[in-house]
Structure formats: structure tokens, C-alpha cells
């Protein structure tokens, strides 16, 4: 039997009088791909926004089964969903930092563990051992994912200078840098050609 990773029950999201999600229930299994399919405006992105803490759902529940814990995603503030629950996402419209390098975009994704290692103090600037070790680890993780998508040679280039398909791949591996327990991809193949879609 497949282990459940995510349980969403009676999820509702209202914006004033507009009902964006109406009593949605579904589950996702561990190590499986689950798709949310619907026309434009059906609320697919809103579901991801609720799962990742960008929106607080009006009603319903969202539970993530992580190791020996059952985490209530509604209890986490937005950035804590990624940090504590291990939920990462990509966006329908690519959201990179275009003036930052390709490598820096991947390092930014790992800022929570770097901040934790510095003790949220200035010690990180003075080469505190834990910070330096975590920084090296973050660079190695970034290099690993750049190698996977074939962009190691572009590591120092501005992310905004990459072709569209490479930007899409970079956004996906940026989410992978935190080793997510749940990865939400919002129209990940949008704008990709057939070859790029197959690679994805």
C-alpha cells in the first residue's frame, strides 16, 4: 500500500464574496506525481498558495505526513512551511532573481539553513565554523543541481540572461536545493518545447 504524503480535506478559499476554492479534498501519495487539472481561473494556483503558506485558507485542513509527524500546514506562517515542513514550489510565471548569478539563485534558496548556522547573529560574518560548513554544503548542493541540468558552465552568468527553458529548469532545481518533502510545480512545462518538456 502506498504511503500518504498529503491530505487535503474540504479546502475552501474565499476572497470577499469570490470563492476561489470550494470544498476541495484530495490526497497525494509519497514518491508519486499528483496532478491538479482544470481550466484557467479554476483555483489551481490558489491551492498551491494555500499549501505553501502564501494564503491562509478560509476553511478546511491540510496535513503533511513527514517521517513520524503529521504536520498541520495551516499552522505555519509562509516561510515556515518551507523551513519546518519541507514544502517547496515553483511558479506559473518564473520567479528568479534575474540580476543575481545562476549560482546565487540556488544559494538564496538555502538561506534558512545558513541563517540557522549563523545563530541569526553577526558571527556568520566572522567565519563561525558552523556557518562556514553550511555555506560549503550549500555550494556543493548548488553545484550538484547545476550539473544535473547542464548549467555548470553558466554558474556565474546572470539568471536573467538564460534562455527561457534554462530559467524554468533553474527555478525547479532551486526548489530542489532544500530537499523538499513535498514539491509543488505550477505549470512546470509552460513555455517549454517538446525536448525541454521531456527532459523535465
Language-model region placement:
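Glycine-rich phosphate-binding loops of nucleotide-dependent enzymes
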Residues: 2-200
Amino acid at each position: 500500500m502506498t504511503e500518504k504524503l498529503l491530505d487535503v480535506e474540504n479546502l475552501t478559499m474565499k476572497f470577499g464574496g469570490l470563492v476561489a476554492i470550494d470544498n476541495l479534498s484530495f490526497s497525494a501519495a509519497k514518491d508519486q506525481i499528483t496532478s491538479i487539472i482544470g481550466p484557467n481561473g479554476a483555483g489551481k494556483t490558489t491551492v498551491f498558495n494555500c499549501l505553501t503558506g502564501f494564503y491562509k485558507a478560509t476553511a478546511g485542513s491540510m496535513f503533511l505526513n513527514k517521517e513520524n509527524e503529521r504536520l498541520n500546514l495551516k499552522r505555519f506562517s509562509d516561510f515556515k512551511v518551507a523551513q519546518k515542513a519541507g514544502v517547496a514550489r515553483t511558479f506559473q510565471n518564473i520567479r528568479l532573481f534575474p540580476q543575481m548569478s545562476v549560482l546565487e539563485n540556488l544559494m538564496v534558496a538555502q538561506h534558512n539553513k545558513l541563517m540557522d548556522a549563523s545563530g541569526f547573529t553577526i558571527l556568520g560574518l566572522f567565519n563561525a565554523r558552523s556557518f562556514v560548513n553550511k555555506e560549503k554544503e550549500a555550494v556543493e548542493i548548488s553545484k550538484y543541481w547545476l550539473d544535473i541540468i547542464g548549467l555548470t558552465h553558466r554558474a556565474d552568468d546572470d539568471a536573467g540572461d538564460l534562455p527561457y527553458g534554462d530559467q524554468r529548469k533553474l527555478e525547479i532545481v532551486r526548489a530542489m536545493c532544500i530537499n523538499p518533502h513535498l514539491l509543488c510545480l505550477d505549470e512546470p512545462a509552460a513555455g517549454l518545447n517538446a525536448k525541454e518538456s521531456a527532459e523535465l
